[in-house]
Amino acid sequence: GAADKGHASVVTLLLADERVDPNMTRRKGFTALMLAARRGHAPVVTLLLANDRVDPNMASQVGNTALIFAAIKGHAPVVTLLLADGRVDPDLTNQYGRTAITCASLNRHDSVVKLLLADDAVWIN
């Protein structure tokens, strides 16, 4: 889809259409926000977060949120955008009991771990 490929102009058109559900899931329960976050498409993540119909805490079939996907892949700019959105819960866990900070640490993404540690909303266990 457009979000997965980073096509911001197409995402803008789709979000303008009230008939389009921005939280619709694809295979494995991925939403547009999860796909954009996983690929590191910061401009698309920005567009999606600006839309109040987007639920940034939705989780895939295995419980990964957009923040967890960005943390797994080490996309620091996307993690920054997600943490800045007051709706994002940084402490949600996937089915393996892992939070975004755990995933970033396991994948050795030090810059993402530092961002998460600096955020007061992140609970350090």
Predicted regions: what they are:
Residues R27-K28, Q61-V62, Q95-Y96:
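Ankyrin repeat start-site detector
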Residues T31-M34, N64-F69, R98-T102:
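Ankyrin repeat (ANK) core detector
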Residues G6-L15, H41-L49, H75-A84, H109-L117:
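Ankyrin repeat structural motif
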Residues A16, M24, L35-A36, A50, ...:
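Intrinsically disordered, low-complexity regions enriched in serine, threonine, proline
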Residues G1-H7, L35-H41, F69-H75, C103-H109:
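Ankyrin repeat A-helix N-terminal signature
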